[in-house]
């Protein structure tokens, strides 16, 4: 007779613990819980990668909207930043555009100067 020992029980308890809070069979039945947990872990892994892309897209959209008020577009602005030697990343620039418009305006003016010199 085959003995289903502690390791098997431990494995099942671990899966059911991860499935706690799921609805219906997904939180009670080991087989259903295992499927749900595997899918959830896959989504978790995938979305950690996607989150970075989505935030970058959001920052770019905010910067683009902010610089258009000053007669520039995003790509020209980023080019001007490089020429002016300003090393602020997109996250900081987007935050500055939303929370500190005066400082952002100064950055835009520096960029415009750098673009006109060259």
Swiss-Prot record:
Alphabetized UniProt keyword annotations: Ribonucleoprotein, Ribosomal protein, RNA-binding, rRNA-binding
Record-level GO BP terms: ribosomal large subunit assembly; translation
InterPro entries named in the record: Ribosomal_bL20 (IPR005813), RIBOSOMAL_L20_CS (IPR049946), Ribosomal_protein_bL20_C (IPR035566)
GO (cellular component) term, any one: cytosolic large ribosomal subunit
GO MF entries: rRNA binding; structural constituent of ribosome
PROSITE patterns assigned: RIBOSOMAL_L20
Top-level lineage group: Bacteria
Role: Binds directly to 23S ribosomal RNA and is necessary for the in vitro assembly process of the 50S ribosomal subunit. It is not involved in the protein synthesizing functions of that subunit.
Family: Belongs to the bacterial ribosomal protein bL20 family.
UniProt protein name: Large ribosomal subunit protein bL20
Annotated organism of origin: Aquifex aeolicus (strain VF5)
């Amino acid at each position: 007779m085959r003995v289903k020992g502690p390791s098997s029980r431990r494995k099942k308890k671990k899966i059911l613990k991860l499935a706690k809070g799921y609805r219906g069979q997904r939180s009670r039945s080991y087989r259903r819980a295992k499927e749900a947990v595997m899918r959830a872990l896959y989504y978790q892994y995938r979305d950690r990668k996607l989150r970075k892309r989505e935030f970058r897209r959001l920052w770019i959209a905010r910067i683009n909207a902010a610089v258009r008020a000053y007669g520039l577009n995003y790509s020209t602005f980023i080019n001007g930043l490089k020429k002016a030697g300003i090393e602020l990343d997109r996250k900081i620039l987007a935050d500055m555009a939303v929370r500190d418009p005066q400082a952002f305006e100064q950055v835009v003016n520096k960029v415009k100067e750098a673009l006109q010199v060259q």
